[in-house]
């Protein structure tokens, strides 16, 4: 049996729409085994126990690339700790987990870069799948049908308070509210802030992250789909967050705080309780490792 662990990811990071993302330490864990025939699932809701399952589709994509005809397959979801449809890369974790598992069955035929190309073909953009695969903060673009990326290790000087609403928001729905065209001014606004965001993590200038987190392309439109967004977002800054942004397509809000700052999580939890906002709060560190096969299990 092959076991694979994949981290959650937070895409866009404010201004880096569809091009920036980072991995954090909450995980989905999968197990795969080739069997004599059939397709079996464990730990998967019944409606997803078929060939349309995103994990299976990713694995089949990898097998097809290798011209490998698998006899049968057992897919198990051992742990699903990444919240679903909350802007934390749950679907990307399934894609990456399936690809890494399939590649292990193939004996490691493909490199991680090749797996990334497959993941991007399946997902459509690299901002979640790249950090899920490589860990850290990844900046990625598509150039001539090839994914060009660079990984930045996130130091332990900051941590990430993940404020998770009690409702789902699909990426498809969140994209419907975005304008089809943007102004030059908004493009310039985001280019500068995306560059600043990257430089903040490279040079440890976390005091500049608040300005770097601002966005003109998606957040102001998507927040209308999220009750209490402005109140919680503003409260994060009031409580001392270094930066705050909508994670992925939402609805999760990500607050960046100093690693030595104590009390933020309890304070935001108390605020949510006082306002009767039934959202969860996770205090997470960055994951710089990315997806990996768990060794020593059978």
Swiss-Prot record:
Entry keywords, A to Z: Amino-acid biosynthesis, ATP-binding, Cytoplasm, Kinase, Nucleotide-binding, Threonine biosynthesis, Transferase
Coiled-coil regions, chain positions: none
Gene Ontology CC terms: cytoplasm
InterPro entries: GHMP_kinase_C_dom, GHMP_kinase_C_sf, GHMP_kinase_N_dom, GHMP_knse_ATP-bd_CS, Homoserine_kinase, Ribosomal_Su5_D2-typ_SF, Ribsml_uS5_D2-typ_fold_subgr
Chemical reaction(s) catalysed: L-homoserine + ATP = O-phospho-L-homoserine + ADP + H(+)
Subcellular location: Cytoplasm
Principal location: cytoplasm
GO terms classed as biological process: threonine biosynthetic process
Enzyme Commission designation: 2.7.1.39
Molecular function via GO: ATP binding; homoserine kinase activity
UniProt xrefs under PROSITE patterns: GHMP_KINASES_ATP (PS00627)
Sites where the protein binds ATP: 83-93
Pathway connected to this protein: Amino-acid biosynthesis; L-threonine biosynthesis; L-threonine from L-aspartate: step 4/5
HAMAP family, per database record: Homoser_kinase
Family per similarity comment: Belongs to the GHMP kinase family. Homoserine kinase subfamily.
Function, in words: Catalyzes the ATP-dependent phosphorylation of L-homoserine to L-homoserine phosphate.
Protein name (record): Homoserine kinase
Source organism of this protein record: Clostridium botulinum (strain Eklund 17B / Type B)
Gene: thrB
